[in-house]
Amino acid sequence: MDSDKIVFKVHNQLVSVKPEVITDQYEYKYPAIGNQKKPSITLGKAPDLNKAYKSILSGMNAAKLDPDDVCSYLAAAMELFEGVCPDDWASYGILIAKKGDKITPTTLVDIIRTDVEGNWAQTGGQDLTRDPTTAEHASLVGLLLCLYRLSKIVGQNTGNYKTNVADRMEQIFETAPFVKVVEHHTLMTTHKMCANWSTIPNFRFLAGTYDMFFSRIEHLYSAIRVGTVVTAYEDCSGLVSFTGFIKQINLTAREAILYFFHKNFEEEIKRMFEPGQETAVPHSYFIHFRSLGLSGKSPYSSNAVGHVFNLIHFVGCYMGQIRSLNATVISSCAPHEMSVLGGYLGEEFFGKGTFERRFFRDEKELQDYELAEATKTDLALADDGTVNSDDEDFFSGETRSPEAVYTRIMMNGGRLKKSHIRRYVSVSSNHQARPNSFAEFLNKTYSGDQR
């Protein structure tokens, strides 16, 4: 008998079918570079840098920027930011630079130029007659790259948040070593003219390149990174959340995963830790894989590892973390089951730190302490472990073990305890819940279930 088939009757006729569902039609692409070639883009003909500066500044003042010209200028301006490589720099087998080499952002990537001329129109404001200084170039580059960060701020941020961010970034590029090149609020006005800079592949690529360079190279103009920092680990919220989670509960990745009691974690954990990726390598191309075009569909995003993401943020909610309460629930990834597991794990790791003495007045005090601790361990091993079951949580050294937590969940029928529900309701009801957030989910799901 075929175990994949089901049998039933239609009009007294026996029917046998094999149920099949649509599979994910988009394959996740891992960012590892196999061809030993640096990430690359193609742009128009390289402009005269000073002419390009005047055109772009004019366009910014008139809120009429040409994205192709902006990208061409940003790529050309990279030559102004020379720094010294502090160590041999390699990623995915590609030697980027050797220790002591003088490099610019263009060293990291391959920018191919065609013979197509840019527009370089003077669209507004007074023409600049003199050639700009390096500081003026740096200020304009910084302001242009700020458009990337502004376009990444989503609509759910209310009030004047985006305007305030724009104003603060503008102030950076009015202060030494930068110089003021535009009037106040020009950045926000320019952003409103085109709010989708982060969706322009070449602009995103250049923002990621600048960020990768300034994150490693000490430079006078490193503050340019204020606009590009959001390209680091972009579309990587699942992996980033997991990293923050293990630091928070003070476990290794291996130890934390032992608590993931659900079959749907299997594929996601396999996906997150695919061999051959440089997830833990500092200054790797991996960090900017999305902006550098190395992955079309990230295997590390919250949607790619939705069960892991949901669990982590339910634990975060239990601990009262604002970031988790505000995060968006991945509704297709068993949020009810994840909230149950999150309640038990939150209880285990919330307010129950691992405390021990680590610092001593002198070596003798350290030796005395270690001897006393060894004696305690010997006594514990000699104990037959027979304690009243009601007091087990207070006496057992294994209360936090994955086995013990799993047993407690099973003994409670896979349901939350009253104390879990009270905690969830407490943290979510006192929070201004955003639509589809974890706070809203907990409020709607458990506020009427305080048994």
From Swiss-Prot:
Homomultimerizes to form the nucleocapsid. Binds to viral genomic RNA. In nucleocapsid, binds protein P and thereby positions the polymerase on the template. Protein P acts as a chaperone on free protein N to prevent it from aggregation before encapsidating genomic RNA. Displays a superantigen activity in human and mouse, activating mostly V-beta-8 subtypes of T-cell receptor. Encapsidates the genome in a ratio of one protein N per nine ribonucleotides, protecting it from nucleases. If expressed without protein P it binds non-specifically RNA and therefore can bind it's own mRNA. Interaction with protein P abolishes any non-specific RNA binding, and prevents phosphorylation. The soluble N-P complex encapsidates specifically the genomic RNA, with protein N protecting the genome like a pearl necklace. The encapsidated genomic RNA is termed the nucleocapsid (NC) and serves as template for viral transcription and replication. Phosphorylated by host CK2. Unphosphorylated protein N seems to have a better affinity for leader viral promoter encapsidation. Phosphorylation of protein N in ribonucleocapsid may stabilize the interaction with protein P, thereby playing an important role in viral transcription/replication. Keywords: Capsid protein, Helical capsid protein, Host cytoplasm, Phosphoprotein, Ribonucleoprotein, RNA-binding, Superantigen, Viral nucleoprotein, Virion. The keyword Disulfide bond does not apply. Its main location: virion. It comes from Aravan virus. The modification Phosphoserine is found at residue 389. Belongs to the lyssavirus nucleocapsid protein family. The keyword Phosphoprotein applies. Disulfide bonds: none annotated. It is found in: Virion; Host cytoplasm. One of its GO terms (cellular component) is ribonucleoprotein complex. Transmembrane segments: none annotated. Signal peptide: none annotated. This is Nucleoprotein. GO terms for molecular function: RNA binding.
